[in-house]
Amino acid sequence: MENQPKLNSSKEVIAFLAERFPQCFSAEGEARPLKIGIFQDLVERVEGEMNLSKTQLRSALRLYTSSWRYLYGIKPGATRVDLDGNPCGVLEEQHVEHARKQLEEAKARVQAQRAEQQAKKREAAGAEGEENGAERRERKPRPAPRRKDNAERKPRAAKPAAAAKPSRPAREERHTPVSDITALSVGQAIKVKAGNNAMDATVQEITKDGVRVQLTSGMSMIVRAEHLVF
């Protein structure tokens, strides 16, 4: 007796009873209505087996008779059975009505529990969404502060000046050199060569040393023939 295994839960006890009394108890499917007073029969026949106590038997029997599949089996005209499956009378109407109310209450409790769980899930999801939204708002970069009108502005870097295009050389004027100063006359306009340039001048006098001319600036000078051009 001491070496027998011990059943720890009411479900294990029900499984044991379904195996020990298959004509009375069932582990699955619709259950048959039990004989009134069947608890005492159980105590007499199985107490001590599997180290079962009265408390364990009572708890297992209460769980079995309050299950939905047992309450579904409490129908008008159904017959109660004893541990060996023998009929023990037809169900009374008050017992059928009591089972129906128990089933409705059990279903209502389950629906209420499901609704409560769904509400908690929605509440948790809403709180999580608000938390994520707050994190996104915190992570959003703030706009840069507007610069005040009187704030010192940093000078912009000057753009490199575009390279000046090389100027085209002035078209060189071609002049005719004076080969014979005797051909000149006083008051005649002429040009005096000074390097690559030619300055306007007026003939004032023709001498043996050259020609005296007056520049537009008013300065007079004697110039040799090789420095005069037309």
From Swiss-Prot:
InterPro entries in the record: ProQ (IPR023529), ProQ/FinO (IPR016103), ProQ/FinO_sf (IPR036442), ProQ_C (IPR035236)
Keyword Nuclease: no
Subcellular location(s) of the protein: Cytoplasm
Basic and acidic residues composition bias: residue spans: 146-155
GO function terms (MF aspect): RNA strand annealing activity; RNA strand-exchange activity
Record's compositionally biased regions (Low complexity): 158-167
One Pfam family it belongs to: ProQ_C
Keywords from the UniProt entry: Chaperone, Cytoplasm, RNA-binding
UniProt region (Disordered), positions on chain: 106-181
Primary location class: cytoplasm
Superkingdom of this protein's organism: Bacteria
GO BP term, example: post-transcriptional regulation of gene expression
Family: Belongs to the ProQ family.
Official protein name in the record: RNA chaperone ProQ
Organism the protein comes from: Cronobacter sakazakii (strain ATCC BAA-894)
Gene: proQ
